[in-house]
């Protein structure tokens, strides 16, 4: 007798999951952690440029602007913004000849 004759083929009504341990707290916790991880990974991939620019430039405080005229403050803001705009960050283009 070959192995092929002993293999059971599932019928359509037997394809449902009948797990007896699906209400186990460890399984529930693992499912929740997995779903949260997937959501965070998707958000990271969608908004990575925005998030990492904010972390790189947004958390750094510049020098104090007390007593500095408004025109110089605006010039400083424009310089900082142009520095952020120039940095596209994570990708390198390599051209082959």
Swiss-Prot record:
Lipid-binding residues (covalent, S-palmitoyl cysteine): 50
Record's keyword annotation contains Transmembrane: yes
Site (Essential for channel activity, possibly by being protonated during channel activation, and by forming the channel gate and the selective filter): 37
Annotated domain remarks: Cytoplasmic tail plays an important role in virion assembly and morphogenesis.
Record protein name field: Matrix protein 2
Main location class: virion
Role of this protein: Forms a proton-selective ion channel that is necessary for the efficient release of the viral genome during virus entry. After attaching to the cell surface, the virion enters the cell by endocytosis. Acidification of the endosome triggers M2 ion channel activity.
């Amino acid at each position: 007798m070959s192995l092929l004759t002993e293999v059971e083929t599932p019928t359509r009504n037997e394809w449902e999951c009948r797990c007896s341990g699906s209400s186990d707290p460890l399984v529930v916790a693992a499912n929740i952690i997995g779903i949260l991880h997937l959501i965070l990974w998707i958000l990271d991939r969608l908004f990575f440029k925005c998030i990492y620019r904010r972390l790189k430039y947004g958390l750094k405080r510049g020098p104090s602007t007390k007593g500095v005229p408004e025109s110089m403050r605006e010039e400083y803001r424009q310089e900082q913004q142009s520095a952020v705009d120039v940095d596209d960050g994570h990708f390198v283009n390599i051209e082959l000849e």
